Amino acid sequence: MSNTTESSSYTSPPEIGDNAPDFNLADADLKMQKLSDYKGKPIVLAFFPAAESPVCTKEMCTFRDSLEELKGYDAQVLGISVDGPFANKIFTENRHLNFPILSDYNRETIMNYGIVMPNLGPLQGYNAAKRSIFVLDNAGKIRYKWISDNPLVEPNYEEIKNALAELKTSA
């Protein structure tokens, strides 16, 4: 399952069936989080352009509000932006987010995932994450991806739930 628009000029996004590139990112409490530490359960990687921006806030709050339902799929949500951990801490506290928000402040992870948005709105030269979703299976393989070149477009949350449901039934 894939709904991908125009690929990044930096590197190509990984394909469905590929192993998700590992990362080691700081959370809002400055604790390092490795993707590989979460193997053994489905993961929803939710990359977003900027903390506290309107669409990003709506998206992360939608994940917050549906977390109990997602736990029914034994899924872990990880939000990832290029914002620093201190900004992500304020975002997490202001929005009462109940899942880790990770900081890709050096932009290495968005480059490895091929989801660099080279100019965020009028901020020429400010590289942010394209709004993107990767659903990973228990082994860390990508089973669903969605990437948007338009930062104003939210993901289809039903597609994400359907991808998780497929993982649960195939387990």
PLM regions: where:
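Chalcogenol-based redox active-site neighborhoods
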Residues: 1-171
